[in-house]
Amino acid sequence: MSATLDRLRRLQELRPQRTRPEPEAPPSPEPLPQPVVTPRGTTRLEELVPGEILENSAGLCYVRTQAYPLASARGQYPLGNLLARHPITFAPFHPNFGLRDTVDFRQAAFIDTETTGLGGGAGVYCFMVGVGTFECGVWSAECGIETNHPNAFPASSDPTHFVVRQFFMRNPAEEGALMFALAELLERYEMSVTFNGRTFDLPLLRTRLQQNQRMYPDLRGSARLLAAERPHLDLLHPARRLWKRRLQSCRLINLEQMILGLQRSEEDVPGHLIPMLYTDYMRTGNAHEMRRVFYHNCEDIVSMVALADHLGRAYAEPAAQSDTPLQGLDWLAMGQCYEKLGQLPSAENAYQQALALLREPAAQADAYQALAQVQKRQGNWPAASETW
């Protein structure tokens, strides 16, 4: 028995032995991306965009204030020239704007928003709301830019500056504070001025205000200026009526270039990129690109002042546009506006002005046809026959 066991042991030793594999080390985790190292202070909002932290009963938000003397030129005319115009000029052409002769541009708030999406809906936030107003007070210059002084006071019959305040929520938790600050400012004014705000900015602000009223009951009944029935001049509509025949686009940036003769700096950012830039800011905390968004928003607001002045001149006294005279297609558009209002003599004059300037055959044909129709409606058959 022992001999048999010895032979079995020797046979076992002759067999190739299996070696137990060493346990594999667990895979090393992929290294986490390292934060971008930049010089101290270059990513902080407070240093890139000087402003102040505003506190109210809903919390904190950030606000940047800039002031422009009324003598500052925006295009060919000083900003203060708009105060010689009256919003009622646009009332006959846009009766649904609710404009009244008792409210002028001194009582207007120029509003522009930057949002987390390009459409509307309850899920879209207004992360920045810029408001421009005519004010008077004490202001100090810093680095060539007028900035708010603590002793400044708003809303006067004799303003000295156009002031832009940009309310910004650094995260969604600050939306309530932003809405409180906005509502407090808007209570002082009687009319809003926007560019495409009738279909975008104001409805979205009303939605966000209603959402926040559930959490902050004190907001209920505030910001009445945003209500649909309050006076509201949306500059996009008179601009389209006047320039849609001549310009391929009536976007604000295009009107700045083609009508006001302005060119923004390289600091500007295309509007369609702004929601993505805010998302990146929320994710990284790097405010470098947000500086460009503040610039874009402020430029939009200040340009509205110059555009309102330009449109006011054109609609009130088109023949007196000596520095920036209307072109042939502009006169054709004005003629159509007057014709819709039943102001046939003014329409006839506008069509005649158009024919004196137009050189393109198709546009001339449109002007001759329109002129003849107006002459016919006035009973001036000999003139209509000659025009035809």
What is each residue range found by the language model?
Residues 134-160:
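Short, basic, low-complexity termini and linkers enriched in Ser/Thr/Gly/Pro
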Residues 123-135, 159-165, 191-192, 197-299:
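Metal-dependent phosphoesterase core characteristic of DEDDh/y 3'-5' exonuclease domains
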Residues 1-104:
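N-terminal accessory regions of nucleic-acid-interacting proteins
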